[in-house]
């Protein structure tokens, strides 16, 4: 027996010794495979795959966020056809508050305990996270109430050593950023819902994909719901009554969101740390959700840390309603930061050369299927030979105009001197202008004398100095500005200014056009009264009638040249003006009226949306246009986005182009669709002498007078614009021409205020609002939301020229006498170089697409403190009754919409609302919330003086951002990271920062190729596919751009 034991011991000891070695050496076994570093942890059966992404940042895949035993799936690439996906089923828990979570991924600050992976760092920047990684093991400590059994990923960043904004360091190291976001979120174990906890003062969003968005501005204890299935109707949780739980400094909050029996439940609670059980009962709100064609598929939580320069998106998968293969492609697009998952999904199918019979094509839009053959044609095949040559010439000039051309383009910003121009480069400049003249359709270079090589060099370098921070994509577009080739470039702008102010009253009017529209008699009054009475009786008999913000340009919307028959597939639109509102309370009128709940305390979201629609059918709180942000041109499916930038040429007809754009946006908002109207018709039907039409200015009053007298406005295609023809006689009207004016009537404003009121026309001078600019801003926002745009009068002389940089935000003063008419088409928020939160107007000019930022520019709403006049001298809007038309009915939800798509400002506003200025305020009262989105004046004005001279530099701060994305499914986390050199890139539907390379060393090459070739592919239906086709290699993936 002893012998047996001895032999057994001799056998067991080596085995035990080998087991100990195996445990020690395989605790963290690192496997290198290409650019992927896989860290396999055998602690408790967890497998952490750390992928070095395109920026050199390690991302973790297959991190199991639970302490339960799990069957590990085999490692597969995202997008592989055999990736397994399962559906989680949910039941209602008996006690929701004590329910254990399956998944919790939280960032709770420095010093938090972690399990399996602990990452520490030194340093923090306002703009850029960049920390090194260390790996260790630790044991998770469960909390008390609502504690989880899950493994949690905690984050922390200290505040010292991250590179500053001006630092040359980037995120090209293998790093895992630590996120001091004080928001924790987790998926409820047996329920369709999440719990979000954190410190009061943060701003976050919860998205129940694809139907409901929840906004939480905890600093003001404001929680709002937006129902995406019902025209984006937004409701405040305090509709039912004031919240009992209020956030204060030092308090924490808890928000529980879950769905049961088609009812959305919200539970909100605030408490002092470690005193949650002692705090008051939670505020509870319930909302009934209508039966929807598509179920809820995931819950997303969006958070941001402005100091660390981090935005985080977590996607908790609760249901998969598409095949695993297709879901894997969509997940891959999500993890690479794509804002339009459908386009990325389509591009991936094309690049992978999937057959049309493939199951994933069921989830592709019908529009894409129709354009399949078009997509497979290279973008440049549509170019004429001169376009090829011009593109090549621009690239050559940009490669030679900088001294350090041998370095990467973005680093090389030193321009060569005039004496450095050699004979070959001079010829290149001359040839460039000849090509530009051939492809230019505005006729500008036909009118002006072309400059010599020295003139062109001076004009070009002046423009490049004004755009020193822009990338090659922007500069390629700027070099299509024809002004660069003019000998005396300052003459380019002289005839583009053409505004004269109207008189303030009929008695002071020296112009027939002024007095004509001031005439308002009892007959007009009675007609308007009858029309309004008729409209109010018949308006919106059908609840399905839709606002035209989402209306496509569709021939069925024509009034005169199309035969629309009401066969049950269309609704009537009865148009009337909707301007009679109290500027101080219109938001309250629209969104804060009492809402009835049923006996169980449940509010019906569908009924509420219909109620809002009936209150103001044209006032739509769209995700592309709301009180905080508005840019309908970003929504490529909208009617307004089809309105192109105009080029008035060498003629002072800015007043016509500003007026016609305003008229066209009103038509879009009223459901008439977009049909480009003829500016030349208005110009040539003016009663002024032909020789004066381009040289003497006018204003929107004359625009209305001409059309009201003629009762006709043809299409642009009927009577095309050429500024050289703006001296001809008023044309005779062929029967084949379309009349866009139709039955339009001018209405008279009945409210008394500080404005110039004319028939069909109202104007407000900012000087009257000097002590109450918030009222002015509210009024303008209202009009832009309601009518799509407003007309503005501004001063451009010695302020705005051909080289004006429209990319940034300018803080400029105005002048007593404006000289130019343009349009405000949107607005938004930004952070200036001093770290102050500010707001801007988005302005559309009529100086061509290649001027400013694709024809637009942004201006601070309030401007510098020392201004005598605001940059916006006057705002003008029309009051029109357009009559009635037929518009197609639209279903509440498209069956082929399967993928996430936010508006382009979604990430920026998330960051902005979490941003705390350096002169941060303490917790404000709830009454301060009303002014939270319009921010005051600062001393910052760059090169601005009281008269507003020569402003070129942007006052907007450049902020680098790291976007961390987490996809949580079956208790498994997959991560993606995208770095943006400027947070404004998150506003772009496409950006080369999202290119991907299997070889990390090839990332910069892929990004540079994308930037260089972008202008060739940007108008292609699938730019990612176009870039892939041009690249020909296999190292780059462009579908994520």
UniProtKB/Swiss-Prot annotation:
It is an enzyme of class 3 (hydrolase). Residues 521-545 have a biased composition (Basic and acidic residues). It is a peripheral membrane protein. It is found in: Parasitophorous vacuole lumen; Parasitophorous vacuole membrane. Coiled coil: none annotated. Changing residue 654 to A: No viable blood stage parasites. Disruption phenotype: Blood stage parasites are not viable. Initial schizont development is normal but merozoite egress is abolished due to a failure to rupture the host erythrocyte membrane. Does not affect poration of the host erythrocyte membrane which precedes erythrocyte membrane rupture. Cleavage of host erythrocyte SPTB/beta spectrin and ANK1/ankyrin-1 is impaired. Residues 101-173, 500-577 are annotated as: Disordered. Glycans are attached at residues 84, 130, 459, 554, 583, 684, 984. Residues 114-149 have a biased composition (Polar residues). This is Serine-repeat antigen protein 6. The lineage of its organism: Eukaryota, Sar, Alveolata, Apicomplexa, Aconoidasida.
